Amino acid sequence: MKHSKLLICFSLLAGILFLIVCCMYAHPLKKSTVIPDFSLADDTISASSDTPKQLSLFASGACLMDVESGRILYGKEEQTPRPMASTTKIMTCLLALEQSSPSEEVSFSSRAVSMPKVHLGASKGSSFTMNDLLHSLMLESHNDTAVAVAEHVGGSVEGFADKMNQKAAELGLNATHFVTPNGLDADGHQSTPADMCRLASYACQNKDFLKIIQTPSKTISDKKGHSYSLTNHDAFLTSYSGALGIKTGFTGKAGYCFVGAAKRENLTLTSCVLASGWPPDKSRKWVDTKALMDYGFTHFKKQKISFQDFSKTPLRVADGIENQVFLRVPEPITLPLASFETLEIHYLLPASVTAPVSTSDPVGTIECRINGSVYNSYPVYPSASVDKITFSHILYEVIDEFLSLFCKK
């Protein structure tokens, strides 16, 4: 009798172990449909016209960028660092707007009043509101004003330069380095046309910045009542349809420079030309800027790109408590595309995945290529998490299966 009980127990134990092993290799116990390999065909929007000729620009470095997407639409040595003269004041103005209030009083130090022309000409100790000085900075490009603003916001010119470089890093201006707040020539003070377009794109989002740079003229006064007349010297603002303005620049080392912005319908563009001639060729920067903007508005149109809806097609999961998972489709994107460009969308998704699966971990990517070059990639995430199958989970299912069989009897 004793041996019979042991034999029965051993048989039951062996049966349970056998079921567990079976479950480990053939989970789940319950019947499920076979999940096929996940696959999607690529999408293509083909070019419908020939590529236009390269622009003939005076500038040594130039860039044209779409503000919304950050896509570079045209470039000429756009990644090459060069001195950028008073276009530096774009960053000076933005930092002052973000880190001070318009009504704050700003005084001129001995360092500020020592700056060379172009300058406001205020005397040491003179005080103005921050708002008035930012108009002096951007309309007349006053070098002494830039130092006064920098010392007020940063504690010193050097401290303000640190803030400028921190902001540049935040904005991804990786080839940009600031030394001065006014853009006067200094060793290591440089940027690229692409970085300056990114900075201008960021500036276009600041309504106070746009209001300042679009002011035609303004009279300001110090606290003692001395008045100063300011006139906007941005000829682009009044000569180009849709122009938003932004900032001119010139030094002996940088040459004539201009960073501009313009908007027509739903397309907003920023441009940058560096070293666009030296005296007496002051107008070349305007010729270059018009050529860049015309190129952008003539050839590029915004297009909404939607990805294939694969949200209802399951992706097979191996070694998981579930044998499938559904995927989330990324939101549509909007891109400026020209008729001479070909857009390809490649779905780089696996045939299956192995558990554990988390909603925060991408399982694949969607790659957008323009004219064969990768423009950007977008991660694809699962819509639910799937835990990895474990011994305890299998044991629970075995017991549940036994109980269900027992209850049926």
Predicted regions and their residues:
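Periplasmic/cell-envelope proteins involved in peptidoglycan metabolism and beta-lactam response
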Residues: 2-3, 11, 165-168
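Structural motif marking the loop-to-transmembrane transition
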Residues: 3-6, 130, 391, 395
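Short, compositionally biased leader-like segments
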Residues: 22-40, 327-341
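Domain-terminus/edge residues, biased toward the C-terminal soluble/receptor-binding domains
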Residues: 174, 185-190, 194-195, 200-409
